[in-house]
Amino acid sequence: LDAETGAPLEGFGGQVPVDGFPSTGVVDMLADLGHPYDPYEGIPLETGYITTSSPPIVVNDTIVVGNSAEQGYLQARVENVPGDILAYDKTTGEFKWKFNVIPRPGEYGHETWENDAWQWTGDVSSWAPLTADPENNIVYVPTNPPTIDYYGGFRPGDNLFGTSVIALDTETGERRWHYQTVKHDVWNYDNPAAPIQLDLNIPGRGIVPAVAQVTKQGYVYTFDRMTGEPIWPMEDRAVPASEVPGEKLSTTQPIPTKPPPFEMQGISEEDLIDFTPQLRREALEVMANYDMGPLFNPPIHAANEAGKISS
């Protein structure tokens, strides 16, 4: 829209095949995602459900759009479409590029999708806002995990670019770098906020241009904006295995050594309230119903022998 008048912008986009839309100022993004769709109904629900939950971002001459799966869309099924990242010319609305958040054959990261799960698994997308780095022609993209949130036995592998931070060249859509904050995510630990750009004054290194990703886990993952190298060392720590049939989790997860976590990591009996002995007893009784543990405590089967509820 023209920001002064609110009228559709002349010369931007074009006619879309839906009655009532103006002949200019509109871009049909569904056409650029590459899936069959009906102009009025969208992508068939048996294929998937796609939407946009955050505003587009303008980086120099490029508009970048992070698409996402509809929140809560049929989490009982494994099929969905991926929320690939789209880019358009900011003046004309002309399509520039698409970045596949689930790599296709021959693309970097395709080998992290075993069982040919890349063909029908979806949900990997960017529902959180993107971050612009106009000086370096970079857009930083935070992503969420694949279908389904708490089980991934049908999609063995690390599942790039799920639950990652991706730096894309805004002119070409090429991946500059990426970092996967959770491998084979079955905890719904999607990156929930726009990456933060900051300049860090580090003793012995001077001013370092950085980008930081705040996470649901209470960690902040901090990287060199240009290279993606962690500012401080990451530790690949061993995590528990899953007892759910068919599930094969990653044996390790990357943990930042700095900064320290800003939130508690998992839960144990020591974390329960003890204002009075009665409250303590009641809290323990409630906790006994749940399978609680460390940060990467695996989800459990609903029909587990202990009769507990996954936390």
Placement of each model-derived feature along the sequence:
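Beta-sheet-rich non-transmembrane sensory/scaffold domains
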Residues: L1-S311
